[in-house]
Amino acid sequence: MTEKLKNSKEVIAYIAECFPKCFTLEGEAKPLKIGIFQDLAERLNEDEKVSKTQLRAALRQYTSSWRYLHGVKPGAVRVDLDGNPCGELEEEHVEHAKATLAESKAKVQARRKEQAQKAREEGKAKAKPAANKKPQQPRRTNKPKVQKPTKPVETRALNADEITVGNAVNVNMGKGNMAATIVEINKDDVRVQLANGLQMVVKAEHLRA
C-alpha cells in the first residue's frame, strides 16, 4: 500500500518533483495558471500518495508564501503544469499580491515585536527581585553539627506495625537516643531524618518508641 504524504510541505515537494517547470522549492516562484488546482487534481487523480484535500491545502500554502507573492509582479506570465505560458498577470492580481505580502510582513513584524517586548518584561521581572536582595554573606564550609545523643530515657523496642514512613521514633545511638522520623524502609534497613535535617540508615532493631 502506498504511504500517503503527511503534510503540505511534503505535498509541495512532491508536486515540485512531478512538475518542475511549474513548481519550485527555491528562488522566485512562477505565477500559476488560474484553475491549476483542477489540472493538478486530474493529473494526480490515480495517485494514492496525495488527496484532493491535501492538494488544495498545499496550493493555498504555496501561493501565500512570500516567495510566491514576490513573483507576482508586473510583466510576469502565468504557467501551467508543464511550464507553458498562460497569459500575463492582470494588474488587479499584482496589486492583490502586493497588499497580501505587505500585510503578511506586517503581521510577522508585529509578532516579533510582541515577543521581544515579552522577553524584555520577563527579563526585568527576574532582575528586579535579584537587585533587591541583600548581598549574601559568604557561606561557611563548617560541617553541619550532628545532634548530640540525649541522655538515656526509658524506651521500648518498636513493634513491626510501628515501623512505618512518617512515624516519629528514637534512634538508639549507644550512649543515648536521638529523636528522628522514618523517611524510607528497605527490608531491615530504615532511613531516618534527625531533627537537624541529617539523614542516616539504621537497622530496624536500633529504633525505639
From Swiss-Prot:
Main location: cytoplasm
Gene3D superfamilies assigned: ProQ/FinO domain
Compositionally biased residues, Basic and acidic residues: 111-125
Coiled coil: none
Gene Ontology terms for molecular function: RNA strand annealing activity; RNA strand-exchange activity
UniProt entry keywords in alphabetical sequence: Chaperone, Cytoplasm, RNA-binding
Gene Ontology terms describing biological process: post-transcriptional regulation of gene expression
GO cellular component: cytosol
Annotated SUPFAM superfamilies: FinO-like
Entry annotated with the keyword Transport: no
Listed SMART domains: ProQ
Compositional bias per record (Basic residues), positions renumbered to this chain: 136-148
Region (Disordered): 101-155
Cellular location(s): Cytoplasm
UniProt key word Cell membrane: no
PANTHER family found in the cross-reference section: RNA CHAPERONE PROQ (PTHR38106:SF1)
Annotated function: RNA chaperone with significant RNA binding, RNA strand exchange and RNA duplexing activities.
Family the entry assigns: Belongs to the ProQ family.
UniProt name for this protein: RNA chaperone ProQ
